[in-house]
Amino acid sequence: MAPGAPSSSPSPILAVLLFSSLVLSPAQAIVVYTDREVHGAVGSRVTLHCSFWSSEWVSDDISFTWRYQPEGGRDAISIFHYAKGQPYIDEVGTFKERIQWVGDPRWKDGSIVIHNLDYSDNGTFTCDVKNPPDIVGKTSQVTLYVFEKVPTRYGVVLGAVIGGVLGVVLLLLLLFYVVRYCWLRRQAALQRRLSAMEKGKLHKPGKDASKRGRQTPVLYAMLDHSRSTKAVSEKKAKGLGESRKDKK
């Protein structure tokens, strides 16, 4: 830079605009989802699911593309394409008469079905979605394994085992609460009986005292009556004795 030349440092306004374009308004790429792997039996059919998320509304120009890479192969070939509301099955490859479109763009679904599976169908299938203006994003891949008989998945077995264990635990918890409820109910009944017995013992002495209080005047009356009777009999005996003396 020559001496006396004006400085070429960026202005603060330009720096703010650059920051806002990079940070405040980041581009959100389209996200595609598929299963990690699917299993199928020879002669059967299998559904390859494909869905996506986009920050934009579903466009009329949305497109789905499926590619297939054989097991052990290097190159992928296009086997299916959906655009302008119409499905197109590629005439190249062994899938041209065995692919069925079952997706619905309105529900962000780009799934296809492959019929009459064969061992040669083993490989990787890639789903690519474009929803203009949202066209930037990664594809998603699903690996197909074809067997003579579809093996039981490890996840299914694990889920069944976990479900069985949870069922046993819930049953034991239910049994525990039933036994506890019956025990508490019995304890409450015994407590009520004991309380009733204690109340009966407290009230019984009071009743006896009242009975004794009512019986006391009767006893005194009987005692006075016996004394008066005894005095009368003594007077009669004394009078008879004196009359006998006078006769003599």
From Swiss-Prot:
Changing residue 78 to L: In CMT1B; severe. InterPro entries: Ig-like_dom, Ig-like_dom_sf, Ig-like_fold, Ig_sub, Ig_V-set, Myelin_P0-rel, Myelin_P0_CS, Myelin_P0_Ig-like. It comes from the Eukaryota. Residues 30-153 are extracellular. Glycans are attached at residue 122. One of its GO terms (molecular function) is structural molecule activity. Changing residue 35 to Y: In CMT1B and CMTDID. Keywords: Cell membrane, Charcot-Marie-Tooth disease, Deafness, Dejerine-Sottas syndrome, Disease variant, Disulfide bond, Glycoprotein, Immunoglobulin domain, Membrane, Neurodegeneration, Neuropathy, Phosphoprotein, Signal, Transmembrane, Transmembrane helix. The chain crosses the membrane at residues 154-179. It is found in: Cell membrane. Changing residue 98 to C: In CMT1B and DSS; severe. One of its GO terms (cellular component) is synapse. The keyword DNA-binding does not apply. Residues 1-29 form the signal peptide. Homodimer and homotetramer. It is linked to Charcot-Marie-Tooth disease, demyelinating, type 1B: A dominant demyelinating form of Charcot-Marie-Tooth disease, a disorder of the peripheral nervous system, characterized by progressive weakness and atrophy, initially of the peroneal muscles and later of the distal muscles of the arms. Charcot-Marie-Tooth disease is classified in two main groups on the basis of electrophysiologic properties and histopathology: primary peripheral demyelinating neuropathies (designated CMT1 when they are dominantly inherited) and primary peripheral axonal neuropathies (CMT2). Belongs to the myelin P0 protein family. This is Myelin protein P0. It comes from Homo sapiens.
